[in-house]
C-alpha cells in the first residue's frame, strides 16, 4: 500500500513515518515526485490548507495523499500565529525568525499567561474523491527563551502541560508520545487499520 505525504519538510516527514511505522504502508513524499509544484498555503484554517495540499498531490500522483497542517495558537496573542505559524515573521522566515518574533511579542507577559496549544490537522484524500480529517492538540505554555536542539518549528519554546522540558529538549520518542501530531496520527492509524481494506485497490 502506498500513501504520499504532501510535504518536503524532512523533519516532518521523518516524524510522520516514525509514528506510522508498523502499518503495511509504503510512505512516499513529494520529494519522490520532483515534478510536483509547491502548493500555496493561503487557506484561512488548518483544514483548508491541509485539504488543498492533499487534493493536489492526490490528483497529480493518482495515489492517496496525506497532508499535515499544524500551528501554534497563543492565548495572549489572540490565537496567533495560528495558520500563519510557518510564515509568522514573513514568507521566507526561518524557524529562528518566527521564534524571535513570537518571543518579542510576549515580552513582559508572565508565565501564567503564556498558555498556548499546538494544533495538528491531517487530511487524507483518496483518488475516488473520499476525504477525511483528523485533529490533534497539545496544550502547554511558551518559555521565555529557546531551549533544546531537537525537533523543528516552535519546539524550542513550547513546554507541554505537565512537563518542564520544551519539545526541543525531548527525545523524538518522548515527543512522539504526547505531541499534537501523534494524537492526529493515532486517529489516522485507527482509521487505516479499520478501513484500509476498502481502499486496498487504491493503496496498492
Swiss-Prot record:
Binds 1 Mg(2+) ion per subunit. Keywords: Hydrolase, Magnesium, Metal-binding, Nucleotide metabolism, Nucleotide-binding. GO terms for cellular component: cytoplasm; cytosol. Its EC number is 3.6.1.66. HAMAP family: Non_canon_purine_NTPase. This is dITP/XTP pyrophosphatase. It catalyses: XTP + H2O = XMP + diphosphate + H(+); dITP + H2O = dIMP + diphosphate + H(+); ITP + H2O = IMP + diphosphate + H(+). It holds the Pfam family Ham1p_like. Mg(2+) binds at residue 69. The keyword Transit peptide does not apply. Belongs to the HAM1 NTPase family. The active site is at residue 69. Homodimer. It comes from the Bacteria. It comes from Thermodesulfovibrio yellowstonii (strain ATCC 51303 / DSM 11347 / YP87). GO terms for molecular function: dITP diphosphatase activity; ITP diphosphatase activity; metal ion binding; nucleoside triphosphate diphosphatase activity; nucleotide binding; ribonucleoside triphosphate phosphatase activity; XTP diphosphatase activity. GO terms for biological process: nucleoside triphosphate catabolic process; nucleotide metabolic process; purine nucleoside triphosphate catabolic process. Its cofactor is Mg(2+).
